[in-house]
Swiss-Prot record:
Protein known as: Tyrosine recombinase XerC
Gene Ontology BP, a term: cell division
Free-text function comment from the UniProt entry: Site-specific tyrosine recombinase, which acts by catalyzing the cutting and rejoining of the recombining DNA molecules. The XerC-XerD complex is essential to convert dimers of the bacterial chromosome into monomers to permit their segregation at cell division. It also contributes to the segregational stability of plasmids.
Subcellular location: Cytoplasm
Record-annotated active site: 169, 193, 261, 264, 287, 296 (o-(3'-phospho-dna)-tyrosine intermediate)
Disulfide bond sites: none
Lineage: Bacteria, Pseudomonadati, Pseudomonadota, Alphaproteobacteria, Hyphomicrobiales
Length: 315
């Protein structure tokens, strides 16, 4: 992905703009971060530079970044908190700024030791919000897709089936190529966060959904290029699937938590409820730490308590 940033030209000097552009290109290229992550870091650092310009009273330059102290970063985070940013967003802001500072330090332009030592805001533990199995099954069929051309309906159903049937992140699903689906394959090799590779089983119903899309797609699908295409033949963007889910929420009366990522949560929660063990689910999701996967035990317990409260005569 290439980033051409023009919006902040009025509140950052060219030396800083050029280095920021180089940093973003490194994130997208060499480090292979997901598009969504790079876009978030671009937005976060843009907000920071706008804040810094107001803070120092002139367009920010590299020399100003070199002079940053933890108190300056705390002032920025406090400003963002006043604007309504939550702990998770503040943590991402700080992670992006640290990454930019490390980039500048590697080039010998700043000494980032002081600023990067600042601790991230404490993150509240929140439970994932899965759909019910009935809701998940309903929205992963081509028939559920609304007022779409047949090939687009098949495409949406295939993508959503991969999220729920394989537990993929949306960026992982949209990065798949026809070469990932050789004839007769029963599994997918997925490269996820941190370039960690995992193998996930491929359910027959998911294979069928993908095959239907490939047959109906009006564009030629190159073996090593992204398989899921937009209406004009370019790579399908996550925002399209997110908008589709928004339409499905309205059409089927689904809760606000019915998002593409909720299908991945549903995959894990339903496996756990069906007797799957945490270690296996950890591998299927590509979590580096078991503690990340253990949050789903809380989801399952919460669902059990909800059923108990609604059904038990003494509740």
């Amino acid at each position: 992905m290439e980033y051409r940033v023009t919006e902040i030209l009025t509140f950052a000097e060219p030396d800083l703009l050029n280095e920021r552009q180089s940093w973003l290109a490194t994130l997208a290229g060499e480090r292979r971060l997901a598009d969504n992550t790079v876009e978030a870091y671009e937005r976060d650092t843009r907000q920071f530079l706008r804040f810094l310009t107001g803070y120092i009273g002139r367009p920010a330059a590299i020399r100003d970044i070199a002079d940053l102290r933890p108190v300056d970063l705390r002032a920025f985070l406090a400003n963002r908190r006043k604007e309504g940013a939550g702990a998770r967003s503040l943590g991402r802001h700080l992670a992006g700024l640290r990454s930019l500072l490390h980039h500048l330090q590697k080039k010998g332009l700043v000494n980032a030791a002081g600023a990067t030592a600042m601790r991230a805001p404490k993150q509240p533990k929140s439970l994932p919000k899965p759909l019910t199995d009935r809701q998940a099954l309903k929205i992963t069929t081509a028939e559920a897709q609304l007022n779409e051309e047949p090939w687009i309906a098949a495409r949406n159903a295939a993508v959503l089936s991969l999220l729920y049937g394989c537990g993929l992140r949306i960026s992982e699903a949209l990065g798949l190529t026809p070469a990932d689906f050789p004839p007769g394959t029963r599994s997918l090799r997925i490269t996820g966060k941190g370039n960690k590779t995992r193998i996930v089983p491929l359910l027959a119903v998911v294979t069928e959904a993908v095959d239907t899309y490939r047959k109906l797609c009006p564009y030629a699908l190159a073996a090593d290029e992204p398989m899921f295409l937009g209406a004009r033949g370019g790579k399908l963007q996550p925002a399209i699937i997110q908008r589709e889910m928004q339409k499905l929420r309205g059409a089927f009366g689904l809760p606000e938590n019915a998002t593409p990522h909720a299908l991945r949560h549903s995959f894990a929660t339903h496996l756990l409820a069906g007797g799957g063990d945490l270690r296996t689910i950890q591998e299927l999701l590509g979590h580096a730490s078991l503690s990340t996967t253990q949050v789903y035990t809380g989801v399952d317990t919460a669902r059990l308590l909800e059923i108990y409260d609604n059904a038990h005569p003494r509740a």
